[in-house]
UniProtKB/Swiss-Prot annotation:
The keyword Transmembrane helix does not apply. The lineage of its organism: Eukaryota, Fungi, Dikarya, Basidiomycota, Pucciniomycotina. This is Geranylgeranyl pyrophosphate synthase. Mg(2+) 3 binds at D249. Binds 2 Mg(2+) ions per subunit. Residues 10-19 have a biased composition (Basic and acidic residues). The gene is GGDPS.
């Protein structure tokens, strides 16, 4: 049917509109049918497809763990693994179970490092850029949390290794120590962010919670899996080792030894109250220079070198820290002797006894 011309020679608007509407309606109806067919075809049997969606591809696992493997591929101190082997001189845990414990502690340790670096806004870890500078903060945090749960999965592999008379709840054991670890980390962050200098006693409690936690997880798991029915109380020694390790780490951070791996005096840049810094501030409460330097979180070498010189020469805090380390090391060696001796553990103490080089004051 041809459009009817109007009296002015144009096509009647109503007729044209009717034709367009008919065409549009037909097209819309066809499109709607296609859409319904596609939805029905794709989702009509969705319940049967749900099971396949539960399958987690290995390629996805690799993507999720990439921030974690980035850090694990960079060699660390391995002090915790060495400690586990040393304590096994006494506890005699079968090798397969011991390797699982090492894996669990390694996972928890690396996950905590990922989180620490984010919370401290660090730049370097083991001499390379920290993970979140490569993968971003959201992905790094998610991976760290994921690895915590992977460690709990590994715990289930230890249950068959428990002695028949053992009543230890492995999950509660690990959970209690992770609570302690986060309590310690929480106080460390609070002091830093509120610029509150703790007492030495408060600092030591924080370290015992934070650094000692992973050491205790390892030894408590080993005690639970040891074939020896009655063992001495090794935990005081474990706690002492954790404190020695952290104080030594604090001292090293103010020396040239750490410059390559962590950056020169990184604790000052992060505004942290480490053991030498706590002693220095508490030794001379009338001088606010060091506290003000921490407030600024300096990145320049000159300011940090000045702070180190102040702690070294004015308050003698570096000498004091070395003295505390020597005193604690002697007590640890005495405790090892009391427990029957342990050549592997004594070797670790000798390694840790090597005091850092004199503090670096010129990095030019």
């Amino acid at each position: 049917m041809k459009p009817v011309p109007s009296t002015n020679g144009k096509v009647d608007d109503k007729v044209e509109h009717h034709n367009l509407s008919s065409s549009s309606s037909s097209s819309s109806s066809s499109s709607s049918s296609d859409t319904k067919f596609n939805i029905s075809n794709r989702y009509g049997n969705f319940l049967q497809r749900l099971e396949a969606l539960d399958i987690w591809p290995e390629s996805n696992e690799q993507i999720l763990l990439e921030p974690y493997t980035y850090l694990t591929n960079i060699p660390g101190k391995e002090i915790r693994s060495m400690m586990i082997d040393a304590f096994n001189h006494w506890l005699q845990v079968p090798r397969p179970a011991l390797e699982i414990i090492k894996k669990i502690v390694g996972q928890l340790h690396t996950a905590s490092l990922l989180m620490d670096d984010v919370e401290d806004d660090s730049d370097l870890r083991r001499g390379v850029p920290v993970t979140h500078k490569i993968y971003g903060i959201p992905q790094t945090i998610n991976t760290a949390n994921y690895v915590y749960f992977l460690a709990y999965q590994e715990l289930t592999k230890l249950k068959p290794c428990l002695r028949s008379d053992a009543t230890t709840d492995l999950w509660s054991l690990v959970n209690d120590e992770l609570l302690q670890l986060h309590r310690g980390q929480g106080m460390d962050l609070y002091w830093r962010d509120s610029l509150t200098c703790p007492t030495e006693e408060e600092y030591l409690q924080m370290v015992n919670n934070k650094t000692g936690g992973l050491f205790r997880i390892a030894i408590k798991l080993m005690i639970a899996l040891s074939p020896i029915p009655e063992t001495p109380d090794y935990l005081p020694l474990v706690n002492l080792v954790g404190i020695i390790f952290q104080i030594r780490d604090d001292l090293l951070n103010l020396s040239s030894v750490y410059t390559k791996n962590k950056g020169f005096c990184e604790d000052l840049t992060e505004g942290k109250f480490s053991f030498p810094i706590v002693h220095s501030i508490r030794s001379d409460s009338t001088n606010h220079q060091l506290m003000n330097i921490l407030r600024q979180k300096p990145t320049d070498i000159g300011t940090k070198a000045f702070a180190v010189s102040y702690m070294k020469d004015r308050t003698k805090s570096l000498e004091y820290t070395r003295g505390v380390l020597i005193c604690l090391e002697e007590q640890a060696i005495e405790e090892v002797t009391r427990l029957g001796g342990n050549p592997a553990l004594e070797s670790i103490f000798e390694l840790m006894h090597v005091l850092p080089s004199p503090p670096a004051t010129d990095q030019n």
